[in-house]
C-alpha cells in the first residue's frame, strides 16, 4: 500500500485520475479513440490498454473489435504448497524468492515454483467470480507465521484446434469451487495414498494451516497429468529440502495463473492500429509485476516522444 501511495502522491498533480469508474469499451480508428466508461466518454489520440491478467478476456474483445491479431497462449495450473518454514529456511534465507524449474521424467513437462512466501500466509483470490488460492508474507516480523508457502505450477500450452486456454483453467477452478465451496486442501500423504483428506485426517496434521479451507481430494479436480507432474516435483524438491514430501505437507487447490493471448504489438508495444497500445500482463508480453511496471514506463516514454 505504501508503494501505491507514493506513486499516487507523485502523479496526482500531473494527471487526472478517475476512481470508481469502469471502462466499458474503446471505439475509434488510428490516433482517434473514444474510451467509454459507465459514467462518461473520453477522447484521445493515444490509448493505453493495461487491464492485467484478470482483464485478459476483455482485452481479447478489444483486439477482436479492432482486428488486432492474437496468438494462443498458456495457462498455468497447480497448487499452493504450505510447509514448515524450517524446511526451506536454508534456501529462503539466501534467496528470498527462489525460482526452481523441473522437467518431469514421466511427461517431460515443466513444473516451477512461484511466489515464494517465507513465514507467510495462504490466502484466497477472487478472479471473475472464481475463488482460487494465492499467498503473501509480511514485512513486519510481528506478523510472521511458522510456515512458508509457494505455488507449484504446470504450464499448459495448447495447439489447434483448441484456443481458449483461460477457459480451460477456469473450468478446473470452478470444479474446485463446486466440490469444496471454495478452496480445497489435501495432505500430501493422503494424495499419494489415493485417499481423500477428511476432517479427521486433517485434524491430525502437525502443521498449523494459515487458511481455512475444505479438506478434500484434489485428484477429483486437477487432471491426472498435471497432478502426476506436481507429485513428481515434490519428491524432487524433497532431495534439496528434506521434509518437503512429508505426509503433512499441505496442498491447496487450485492455483491458476491466467495469461492473455499474446497480442500482436511492435517493439514499442503499439498495435497495428496506430496510437493503440496494449501492455502489461494483459498483453501476454510480460509475466510479472516488475515486467508489467517496466512496460508502462517504456510505453509512457514512447508516447511522450511524440509530443516533443
Predicted regions and their residues:
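Residues forming the flavin
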Residues: 1-308
Amino acid at each position: 500500500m505504501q508503494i501505491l501511495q507514493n506513486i499516487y502522491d507523485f502523479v496526482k498533480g500531473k494527471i487526472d485520475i478517475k476512481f470508481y469508474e469502469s471502462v466499458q469499451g474503446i471505439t475509434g480508428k488510428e490516433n482517434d479513440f473514444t474510451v467509454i466508461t459507465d459514467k462518461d466518454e473520453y477522447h484521445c489520440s493515444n490509448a493505453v490498454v493495461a487491464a492485467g491478467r484478470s482483464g485478459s478476456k476483455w482485452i481479447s474483445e478489444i483486439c477482436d473489435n479492432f482486428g488486432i491479431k492474437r496468438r494462443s497462449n498458456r495457462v498455468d495450473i497447480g497448487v499452493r504448497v504450505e510447509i514448515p518454514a524450517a524446511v526451506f529456511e536454508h534456501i529462503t534465507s539466501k534467496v528470498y524468492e527462489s525460482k526452481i524449474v523441473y522437467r518431469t521424467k514421466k511427461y517431460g513437462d515443466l513444473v516451477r515454483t512461484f511466489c515464494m512466501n517465507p513465514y507467510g500466509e495462504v490466502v484466497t483470490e477472487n478472479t471473475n467470480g472464481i475463488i482460487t488460492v494465492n499467498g503473501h508474507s509480511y514485512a513486519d516480523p510481528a506478523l510472521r507465521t511458522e510456515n512458508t508457502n509457494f505455488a507449484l505450477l504446470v504450464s499448459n500450452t495448447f495447439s489447434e484446434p483448441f484456443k481458449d486456454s483461460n477457459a480451460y483453467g477456469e473450468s478446473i477452478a470452478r470444479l474446485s469451487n463446486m466440490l469444496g465451496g471454495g478452496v480445497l486442501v489435501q495432505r500430501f500423504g493422503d494424495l499419494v495414498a489415493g485417499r481423500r483428506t477428511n476432517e479427521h485426517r486433517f485434524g491430525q496434521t502437525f502443521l498449523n494451516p494459515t487458511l481455512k479451507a475444505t479438506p478434500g481430494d484434489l485428484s477429483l479436480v486437477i487432471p491426472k497429468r498435471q497432478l502426476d507432474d506436481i507429485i513428481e516435483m515434490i519428491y524432487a524438491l524433497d532431495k534439496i529440502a528434506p521434509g518437503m514430501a512429508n505426509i503433512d505437507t499441505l496442498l491447496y487447490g487450485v492455483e491458476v495463473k491466467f495469461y492473455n493471448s499474446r497480442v500482436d504489438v511492435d517493439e514499442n508495444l503499439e498495435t497495428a492500429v496506430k496510437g493503440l497500445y496494449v501492455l502489461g500482463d494483459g498483453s501476454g508480453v510480460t509475466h510479472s509485476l516488475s515486467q508489467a511496471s517496466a512496460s508502462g514506463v517504456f510505453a509512457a516514454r514512447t508516447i511522450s516522444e511524440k509530443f516533443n
